[in-house]
């Protein structure tokens, strides 16, 4: 594709859409400097293009993602085949996944679109940090079409999974004749699936034959179901949505995760860890390849800034579908990177969200002397407090802040007797190892005398305080022998 786009560019000007595709291909092939040059060319003619701006705002982003290679680790697992293996999730002591290895229900049926075997659900035993002994699941779940990405509600003993929108043998096709994806669920008892052939299978109430609904992911408390859909109201190709559990097998109206998470591209494979972190895959958030793995924290006010998990979890290939075990650090993901057995392979991983260190000093603006004991906080480029930042105050006014990657930071500081001040940092252009935060002393003056209310005699040793407009104490002192005070 890269050669074809290069030839097209040599023949004449490309459209903006073709230029973006060309830049994305360059990025996917690991040619990051050339990709940045292409994005810059697009920006010259379309300066308000949101997707292009996101890449240009962090021109060295790709190199920094690749450098952070020691925090995460990747390992192979012995359950892959020569076909596609993907769609991982965890059910108690089992790893569930989808495979096109052709050992499923009905034999090796082929999907006409790509002449590949239909996907079926398999299980494998979790053993430490790996999985072994893959085994195809029963026909209570698998059928002769696609059966894919699943999620397990351990509290309700219920499995939600993606399949072609087929129920009781009826193909629920769109008006165009296309068979879309839907979510279905079945309950499990005593570690076994329901013995009813299809009686235990229930369609998700928000399935619709006119659009795809899939990639379900239940929150650890079972109160929210996340899923992927191309339904109306989204921002791009496929968006991440969620529904609240209303009880009695009812779900609230689907809500879109919003512009923090969803883009003009495709977001897929949501997964929520025990510490309220949403992991997902995207081909439009700035990343190393086609699809990268990302995360953001879920807060009462909404999702935090989206962070790329970096290399080696992400490469120039398609890396996606990250899930974690109960320890929130050991997990699995899917990639089509080189060196695998099939078109898609399952990999084990150890995950630590990427962080970077900001170092600096707090000083008096006039005297340039170090200020000890200042209180700092840090916000991202959207003005949100970065609650997961680790701020350490050292001697001589020095500080260290370990913080996730972001496009911009604002560090603010204060101390009694000083005005609050902040410094903005662009990690793409500003040094992160010598940040200066300058604080100004309050510019005030006040003097007076404290006297006895009746005798009018000066009072010695009376405590006097100076407060700001918010009743915050700025300074206190005691009166001199003549009853006078001076601030």
Model-derived features: positions:
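Canonical positions in the second alpha-helix
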Residues: 7-8, 41-42
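Structural marker of alpha-solenoid helical repeat scaffolds
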Residues: 11, 44-45
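Short, conserved micro-motifs composed of acidic
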Residues: 18, 28, 32, 45-361, ...
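Short, ordered, surface-exposed loop/turn motifs in non-cytosolic proteins
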Residues: 237, 367-383, 454-472
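Short, acidic Ser/Thr/Gly-rich low-complexity loop/linker segments typical of extracellular
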Residues: 381-398, 470-484
């Amino acid at each position: 594709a890269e050669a074809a786009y290069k030839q097209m560019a040599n023949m004449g000007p490309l459209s903006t859409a073709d230029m973006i595709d060309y830049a994305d291909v360059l990025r996917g092939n690991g040619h990051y400097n050339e990709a940045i040059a292409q994005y810059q060319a697009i920006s010259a003619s379309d300066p308000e293009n949101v997707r292009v701006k996101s890449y240009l705002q962090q021109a060295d982003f790709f190199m920094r993602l690749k450098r952070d290679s020691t925090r995460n680790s990747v390992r192979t697992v012995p359950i892959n085949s020569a076909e596609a293996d993907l769609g991982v999730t965890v059910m108690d002591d089992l790893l569930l996944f989808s495979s096109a290895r052709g050992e499923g229900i009905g034999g090796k049926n082929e999907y006409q679109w790509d002449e590949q075997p239909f996907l079926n659900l398999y299980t494998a035993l979790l053993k430490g940090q790996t999985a072994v002994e893959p085994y195809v699941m029963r026909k209570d779940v698998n059928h002769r079409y696609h059966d894919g990405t699943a999620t397990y509600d351990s509290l309700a003993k219920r499995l939600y999974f993606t399949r072609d929108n087929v129920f009781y043998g009826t193909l629920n096709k769109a008006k165009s004749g296309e068979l879309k994806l839907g979510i279905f669920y079945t309950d499990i008892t005593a570690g076994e699936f329901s013995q009813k052939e299809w009686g235990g299978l229930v369609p998700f109430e928000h399935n619709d034959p006119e659009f795809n609904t899939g990639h379900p992911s239940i929150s650890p408390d079972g109160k929210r179901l996340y899923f992927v859909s191309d339904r109306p109201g989204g921002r791009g190709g496929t968006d991440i949505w969620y529904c609240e559990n209303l009880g009695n097998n009812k779900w609230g109206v689907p809500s879109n995760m919003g512009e923090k998470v969803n883009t003009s591209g495709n977001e897929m494979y949501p997964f929520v860890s025990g510490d309220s972190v949403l992991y997902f895959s995207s081909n439009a958030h700035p990343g190393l390849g086609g699809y990268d793995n990302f995360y953001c924290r879920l807060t009462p006010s909404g999702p935090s800034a989206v962070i790329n998990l970096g290399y080696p979890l992400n490469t120039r290939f398609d890396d996606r579908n990250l899930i974690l075990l109960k320890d929130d650090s050991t997990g699995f993901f899917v990639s089509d990177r080189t060196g695998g057995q099939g078109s898609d392979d399952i990999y084990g991983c150890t995950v630590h969200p990427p962080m970077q260190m900001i170092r600096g000093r707090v000083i008096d603006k006039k005297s340039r002397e170090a200020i000890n004991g200042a209180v700092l906080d840090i916000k991202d480029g959207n003005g949100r407090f970065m609650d997961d930042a680790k701020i350490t105050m050292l001697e001589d006014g020095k500080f260290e802040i370990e913080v996730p990657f972001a496009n911009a930071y604002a560090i603010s500081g204060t101390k009694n007797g000083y005005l609050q001040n902040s410094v903005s940092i662009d990690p793409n252009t500003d040094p992160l190892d010598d940040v200066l935060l300058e604080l100004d002393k309050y510019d005030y003056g006040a003097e007076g005398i404290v006297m006895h209310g009746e005798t009018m005699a000066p009072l010695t040793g009376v405590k006097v305080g100076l407060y700001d407009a918010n009743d915050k104490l700025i300074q206190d002192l005691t009166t001199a022998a003549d009853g006078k005070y001076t601030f």
